[in-house]
């Protein structure tokens, strides 16, 4: 029975989780998943060039212009 009051006090000391987000999103916030999707799409477009030589990565970059 001694443990019950200690347990209740510990429960009261634990902060509860906020029901809403603490920080509001701004227009500059971009989900990280969309950033990775854009990077993958760009790399895929660079590698899908017909005249791109796999041995030389730099030749792919010159064809993007």
Swiss-Prot record:
Similarity-based family: Belongs to the conotoxin T superfamily.
Name this polypeptide is given: Conotoxin Lt5.1
Signal peptide: 1-19
Post-translational modification: Contains 2 disulfide bonds that can be either 'C1-C3, C2-C4' or 'C1-C4, C2-C3', since these disulfide connectivities have been observed for conotoxins with cysteine framework V (for examples, see AC P0DQQ7 and AC P81755).
Domain notes: The cysteine framework is V (CC-CC).
Species assigned in the record: Conus litteratus (Lettered cone)
GO-annotated cellular components: extracellular region
Propeptide part(s) removed at maturation, as residue ranges: 20-48
Alphabetized UniProt keyword annotations: Cleavage on pair of basic residues, Disulfide bond, Secreted, Signal, Toxin
GO molecular function (one): toxin activity
Tissue: Expressed by the venom duct.
Highest taxon listed in the record's lineage: Eukaryota
Cystine pairings recorded for this chain: none
Localization of this protein: Secreted
